């Protein structure tokens, strides 16, 4: 993995920030304005929350985007695509586990549709035309992938990718893989809510804060200032 190791750099971030910014000044991905999906789910008359697992590079930024999205009740950073036994940060970083850094997005379909979730995913959460890398991070664990849980999710995602490619919305073809969800394994606690807890960490400032800003700018109706966080969800009730 190409991100600076957390064990030492959180303490050294202030000292390294000047040189780090100079090296990664162009790392942030630009947002792309894209049309809404023609094929989408209809809000069910009843039922509960739904979930989709998305991979789009470093999970810090993807998680932050959905934590600020109205209708999302939880966004958890984790790993998908490999075995439970190898779902650990250090092992995933070897690029031999099959895992992708992913975010499990739980949402209320009465407030936001899967199609809108995917519109945000393709436009501000990551660049879907980059094969096995995102910004400064490279390797299969940073691949663009939608881990679909059922046929409806697969159908909507397939149709949307075809729609965007046919419209030539991006300068290059979309490389997002559709993979059947076989398991999602939450990442270590120190990865959860990383942007919320470390908003001035250099990697976050350069690569991920712009994503949240683009969400607010391009999806004002879906944006919320106060994020829904994992730590808040796990906080014991009084």
How would you name each of these model-derived features?
Residues 2-5, 16-238:
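Flexible coil/turn and secondary-structure edge motifs
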């Amino acid at each position: 993995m190409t991100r600076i190791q957390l064990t030492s750099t959180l303490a050294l971030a202030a000292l390294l920030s000047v040189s780090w910014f100079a090296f990664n000044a162009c790392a942030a991905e630009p947002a792309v304005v894209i049309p809404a999906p023609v094929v989408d789910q209809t809000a069910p008359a009843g039922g509960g929350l739904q979930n989709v697992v998305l991979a789009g590079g470093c999970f810090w930024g993807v998680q932050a985007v959905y934590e600020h999205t109205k209708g999302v009740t939880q966004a958890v950073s984790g790993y998908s695509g490999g075995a439970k036994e190898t779902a650990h940060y250090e092992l995933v970083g070897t690029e031999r586990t099959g895992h992708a850094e992913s975010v499990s997005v739980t949402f209320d379909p009465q407030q936001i549709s899967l199609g809108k979730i995917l519109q945000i995913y393709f436009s501000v959460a990551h660049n879907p035309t980059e094969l096995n890398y995102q910004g400064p991070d490279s390797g299969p664990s940073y691949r663009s992938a939608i881990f679909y849980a059922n046929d409806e999710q697969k159908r909507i995602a397939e149709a949307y990718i075809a729609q965007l490619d046919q419209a030539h919305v991006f300068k290059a073809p979309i490389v997002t893989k559709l993979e059947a969800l076989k398991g999602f394994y939450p990442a270590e606690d120190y990865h959860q809510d990383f942007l919320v807890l470390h908003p001035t960490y250099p990697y976050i400032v350069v690569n991920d804060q712009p994503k949240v800003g683009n969400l607010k700018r391009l999806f004002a109706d879906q944006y919320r200032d106060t994020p829904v966080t994992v730590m808040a969800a796990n906080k014991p009730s009084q």
